[in-house]
Amino acid sequence: MTVHDKAHDLGYALRNSAEYQAFLSAKQHLDNDAPGKAMVQDFFKKKLIAEYDLMAGNPEDKEKSQELQKMYEVIVLNPTARDFIHAHMRFQQVAADIYKIIGDAVAEGMDLFGKE
């Protein structure tokens, strides 16, 4: 079996995983809740901007962090939005675990751009 075959198997396993199926179900429900969907989209947009700022080396903006925390507190009051956020987080954790497993498996030789 080739690496590509294994990758296809992994894709199939992910697509059929409980975490991904829960994510899809939560997304379907969110798609039917326009106010909840707008809140989630705004939250993710602002969260992504804050993460990009941190990756660019900028210090954490406490005001933006507090705004995100307040937005999250409002989102969790909407069960549909809350369920989507939680399902998204669970699936993202699965994806992160897989990326780590793959990264660890091929770490040797990948230090070309590492710090010297």
For every predicted segment, state its role.
Residues 1-116:
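Terminal, compositionally biased segments used for targeting/anchoring and flexible tails
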